[in-house]
From Swiss-Prot:
GO CC list: ribonucleoprotein complex
This protein's encoding gene: nop10
Stored InterPro entries: H/ACA_rnp_Nop10, H/ACA_rnp_Nop10_sf, Nop10_arc-typ
Family: Belongs to the NOP10 family.
Full protein name: Ribosome biogenesis protein Nop10
HAMAP family the UniProt entry points to: Nop10
Record-linked Pfam families: Nop10p (PF04135)
GO BP terms, alphabetized: pseudouridine synthesis; rRNA processing
Amino acid sequence: MKSDIRVCEAWRSHHDGPVYTLSETCPECGGDAVNSAPAPFDPADPHGKYRRALKERRRL
């Protein structure tokens, strides 16, 4: 999922908490800002097979 909100890539080492911005760079330290939205799923999810099977059973 693509989000307009970005977070400072180095916030764990340079800031007390996450620093959010809409620009490409961090307003406090000038570092790179990255997409703050997590991936919607993990392709290597070990439980994905069971989750999909449960979803399929609920459709019937």
